């Protein structure tokens, strides 16, 4: 279960999973397990954020990018 997922709109959920899939495809095999989303929220700028199993968190943008 992903903490905070219920607070996202359907559009935000689609963005979350789409960008995470792209993000996961870009990392090496050793890192793929840590790319699982464990928590999500929307920040004050209305940007979807995701905390991953590896402890890192990212902003996921409408342009299908992350930072």
Walk through the language-model features, giving the residues of each.
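Short linear proline/tyrosine/threonine-rich motifs used for host-factor recruitment
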Residues: 50-52
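A short, surface-exposed beta-strand/turn
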Residues: 56-67
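N-terminal non-globular leader segments, chiefly Sec-dependent signal peptides
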Residues: 1-47
């Amino acid at each position: 279960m992903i903490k905070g997922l219920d607070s996202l709109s359907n559009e935000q959920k689609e963005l979350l999973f789409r960008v995470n899939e792209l993000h996961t495809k870009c990392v090496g095999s050793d890192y793929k397990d840590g790319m699982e989303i464990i928590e999500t929220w929307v920040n004050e700028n209305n940007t979807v954020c995701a905390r991953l199993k590896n402890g890192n968190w990212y902003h996921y943008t409408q342009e299908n990018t992350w930072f």
